[in-house]
Amino acid sequence: MPPSNGPLGVGMDDPLVTLKTDVVIEPLVERWHAWAHLVSPVTSSLNAKYRHLAVLESFVTAPSAHVSACQNPKLRGGPFVDLPVSEVGAVKALIESTKARQAKQIEFGDALRESFRMIMKQADGFSIEPLYEQLPEPVKGYVELTYTIGGYPDLRVNEPLLYLSPAYNRSVQSAAIYRAQGDDRPFAFSTPKMPGPNIFELEEPFDSQVYDYLARLRHYPQRRSEVLAALKVGSDRTDLVSDFLTEAPPATLKPSEKTGKTRWRYFGHACVLVEAPDGTNMLMDPVVAYEGKSGVERFVLSDLPERIDYVVLTHNHADHVLIETLLALRFRVDTIVVPAGGGSVADPSLKLMLQSIGFKNVIELDSLGTIESGELTIKALPFLGEHGDLDVRSKAAWFVRSGETTMLFAADSNNLDPVLYDLLRKAVGRVDILFIGMECAGAPFSWTYGPLLPVAVDRKKDQTRRLNGSDCEKGLKVVKSLGSTEVYVYAMGAEPWLQFITSIDPSEDTAPATNARQLVEACQTMGIKALRLFGKADVTI
């Protein structure tokens, strides 16, 4: 897409410009970093009150305690607002804004929680039909009361209908635009992005075309005056936004080439680009870094192909579905492939969420569902664990065939039942290359799902139901079952640009790092090529 107003250098008073490579466009929901649970109506409604308001009110009550906790590395990732005491007034204003702007969502969330408590108390195995009359008004018509086959009461939501209701609130969607100061950011789950003199506020919902305009502006120059007009920049913010822009020629986006070979590139964490011999490509769990000064080598957005045939998502956690990167890629993506969901409160639809933020072509695949395109095959495989034993079905490991090479992207799959991988070997054959995580010391499940629970979980039980992936022993069984000849440990959250959403301790003496090292060594002892990935990698087969 060439610039519409002539070549670089024309019009010195109105030059052609692009975004600087360190400019962050961070999507926000009522000032909180936007992750999928803050877009989907049910989870957004419950998080507004039971996560956001709860932690903000705690900060206002004891700001010094929060400041002290945030200075302790062992407490990173905890419910502590990483703001100075001087921000108490601004936080009080955010509390009032949240209560006003998200009032209908909070009302729905309270009604949903009340409905759950009601059926837990009153549904005793007899017909559940009389309980519909007791449902609070905000949820009537949006929920179905059921029993599980084991006789336990449950509640399901009509999620498509909720996107047409007040529980879905586009008006609280916006973005903060600023220049990155290295890779460090406050922990996104507990600290809102407050306004500041170096931040430009973009008051547009995520489905707005302005996000595509900004994404293109990273690669295709436009007149400076057009950029200021497109962003509706007032005279008092012109200098700030101008600092986001550069006249330096941008990196050129290149198409995937027909090389006759398979190439894969690791972009950090669980993000891997696969290019098939005929040039068909897919991008797994896109989380792409900005230009950084941390010393960690990295690929950036301009290293991706000009067109991305398939974006494939493994599961609905913030470090695998990063809306910030997805919006930066939206204009380049043909199709997004996601695991089909189950429709429970803890399992919002990835397809509906992505469609609501402007993605037109989203395909859901059930287990063993397959897409074939040229020399690339993508198949959904079962993904056990890592969700605190909740009935979450929006998760898949992905089997990929690129030319004659087979791969499995297992992400955070926990090998709870090794027989599964024996069965998968029969279903898909030997897997040449295994990508598997070793995050075997995850947080208690309430860390992510606590705001969704109708009643608080017992702490001892919570500690046993962790968001764990496989450890070395379990991972080694996967390797043996699938007959893999290459093994790559990934999805460890160790890259510095992941810390603001994972809060994972990147040191080498942790249980995940130890298990990753043990798996690599065990594989190498068996003559299997093995490596723990970090930062970037580029492999042609």
Q: Can you name each region flagged by the protein language model?
A:
Residues E291, H317-V321, G343-A346, S367-E372, ...:
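Active-site environment of divalent metal-dependent phosphoester hydrolases
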Residues F299-D366:
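Active-site HxH/HxHxD metal-binding segment of metal-dependent hydrolases
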